[in-house]
Amino acid sequence: MVLIRVLANLLILQLSYAQKSSELVVGGDECNINEHRSLVAIFNSTEFFCSGTLINQEWVVTAAHCDSTNFKMKLGVHSKKVPNEDEQTRNPKEKFFCPNKKKDDVLDKDIMLIKLDSPVSNSEHIAPLSLPSSPPSVGSVCHIMGWGSITPIEKTLPDVPYCANINLLDDAVCRPPYPELPATSRTLCAGILEGGKDTCVVDSGGPLICNGQFQGIVFYGAHPCGQALKPGVYTKVFDYNDWIQSIIAGNTAATCPP
């Protein structure tokens, strides 16, 4: 069954007012406390439900399907139970979506830009990850991370973020398992062909970091997570660089690429 990394929990959200679901890293290990300084936890009154990436002191990039009412963002978080001294919490001041996104089409232009209600300060556990200077190459080793489920079928959410390395694959690899994706979708295909490592429920909106650059946003994949020949699909950040930079510069009428 194919699910947007957030849709796995969507029914739960509707029934329990939790939040839209994302995915967690299956087949990974606990992240080093200092290796996810740009990772943002997006949460509501009950739980973490998505992640995002801090790209400067005032802006966060995540998936459009992570939008919800009354959410907050935590930066500098590692353990949900044992807070770091430098953790900072922010509210969204403004949220931006592609104005040319097809209405009610969750598969189209899955990216959201959030302006924080006040800037954050760099610290031991907080630092932005800049936008990519060039697109990634097939074969690149990419890093995934998040508080998503660490088991492929049942939702098992960890107290700390998990990390794993996967490979950037040719886009054609993701077409057979996901024929519903638009032919012109600006996405990346990444995973392990034999399966076992993948983002999963509650990882949605988090980063795909290839060769140290923020290249993708957790978007779409299969459920159960981590299946062979069913890699994850990630929104391609590089293709949205101009739109992001235009919004930050104050051109709120900017449109995304088709």
Swiss-Prot record:
GO terms for cellular component: extracellular region; secretory granule. One of its GO terms (molecular function) is toxin activity. Snake venom serine protease that may act in the hemostasis system of the prey. It holds the Pfam family Trypsin. Residues 19-24 form a propeptide. It comes from Crotalus adamanteus. Keywords: Disulfide bond, Glycoprotein, Hemostasis impairing toxin, Hydrolase, Protease, Secreted, Serine protease, Signal, Toxin, Zymogen. Monomer. GO terms for biological process: proteolysis. It is found in: Secreted. The keyword Lipid metabolism does not apply. SUPFAM superfamilies: Trypsin-like serine proteases (SSF50494). Its main location: secreted. This is Snake venom serine proteinase 5. It is an enzyme of class 3 (hydrolase). Glycans are attached at N44. The keyword Protease applies. Its EC number is 3.4.21.-.
